[in-house]
Amino acid sequence: MPVLKPKEVVAALERAGFEIRRHTGSHVIMYKPDLRRPISVPQHPRDLPKGTIRAIIREAGLTVEEFMKLL
């Protein structure tokens, strides 16, 4: 898994059908109609840790392979 910037993760989730609902503090909150829970993506100037990216992918209901195709 490559190291990604927060903007890259948000863009990939948007391609997967997620919408930005709000930008609260240092996090972007994204929703998708068929998921009950929102996805929170940290918006820091540095790259996201691999564990954080994997957690976001898991919460979004995607596999790593599906997510990589969206990049």
Regions found by a protein language model. Name each.
Residues 1-23, 27-71:
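Basic nucleic-acid-binding interfaces
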